[in-house]
Amino acid sequence: MMSYLKQPPYAVNGLSLTASGMDLLHQSVGYPATPRKQRRERTTFTRAQLDILEALFAKTRYPDIFMREEVALKINLPESRVQVWFKNRRAKCRQQQQQQQNGGQNKVRPSKKKTSPVREVSSESGTSGQFSPPSSTSVPVISSSTAPVSIWSPASVSPLSDPLSTSSSCMQRSYPMTYTQASGYSQGYAGSTSYFGGMDCGSYLSPMHHQLSGPGATLSPMGTNAVTSHLNQSPVALSSQAYGASSLGFNSTDCLDYKDQTASWKLNFNADCLDYKDQTSSWKFQVL
């Protein structure tokens, strides 16, 4: 035990730590305070000094040592102060230029954002303008139900009853052939399925044996202008329905006997039933 205590001090990297050296690590031992670097006082420039420095900065942003010393003698300041002033002045100038560029970009960007809603509004107005003609054409169709004269009902047959005159749309038919009749009316039908749209019923229901009120007129199934002109004279308008398995909305006791043939069209009004005869298939509709 005694031999262990008498061993030489432990060596670290060739340096022996003695007991006296260990005392330096004790808390009670005071260490010499490091000298604190004193802060340099801020230099204040007068108006005359700033005028001289600004005049030199206007000539050159990077003056050499001789120019700085000459100006330092004029303003009674050390050359190091003049050098620092030019350094700060260049940094300030770069900052102002960057702010101007950013400000210009920020002004341009909102203008781009403002133009995009204008384009959207114009596109919306364009789309609404495209859909406005159908709405304008539908207005005279609604107002045409009060006209007193029938254009397709023959004189020998009474027109349909009042419930049919309450609706504002007429029947529109399409057939795959074009029929030209002896009475001088040209009717073109396209498509295989028949349906009821907003077109003139007189253009499709007027038979070849009955003449319309307007002599020599050519009835087009897709002409909306002719539709409105004929509807202004007709009190009868049929509701928009699919012409197929569904029944027709006839509230009158009159019946429509419609025969579809390749060479002739016949329209008859009977008393109790609606009989629709076709070559390919037979459909019978009766009002209950």
UniProtKB/Swiss-Prot annotation:
In terms of superkingdom, the source organism counts as: Eukaryota
Molecular function via GO:
DNA-binding transcription factor activity, RNA polymerase II-specific; RNA polymerase II cis-regulatory region sequence-specific DNA binding; sequence-specific DNA binding
Q: Which residues bind DNA?
A: 38-97
Q: Where are the stretches annotated Disordered?
A: 93-140
Gene3D superfamilies, alphabetized: Homeodomain-like
User: SMART domains under this entry?
Assistant: HOX
Quote the InterPro entries the UniProt record gives: HD (IPR001356), Homeobox_CS (IPR017970), Homeodomain-like_sf (IPR009057), Otx2_TF (IPR003022), Otx_TF (IPR003025), Otx_TF_C (IPR013851)
Q: Where is this site: Determines DNA-binding specificity?
A: K87
Give the UniProt tissue specificity note: Shows a localized expression in the dorsal region of the marginal zone at stage 9.5. At stage 10.5, expressed in dorsal bottle cells of the dorsal deep zone fated to give rise to prechordal mesendoderm. Also begins to be expressed in presumptive anterior neuroectoderm where expression persists in subsequent stages. At stage 14, expression is confined to mesendoderm and ectoderm cells of anterior dorsal regions.
Keywords attached to this entry: Developmental protein, DNA-binding, Homeobox, Nucleus
Q: Where is the composition biased (Low complexity)?
A: 95-106
GO cellular component: a single term: nucleus
Q: Quote the subcellular location field of this record.
A: Nucleus
One Pfam short name: TF_Otx
Free-text function comment from the UniProt entry? May play a central role in the initial events of axis formation and in particular in specifying anterior head regions and their spatial relationship with trunk structures. Activates the head organizer gene cer1 by acting synergistically with siamois and mix-A/mix.1 through the 5'-TAATCT-3' element of the cer1 promoter. Also binds as a complex with lhx1/lim1 and ldb1 to the gsc promoter to stimulate expression.
> What name does UniProt use for this protein?
Homeobox protein OTX2-A
Gene (UniProt) = otx2-a
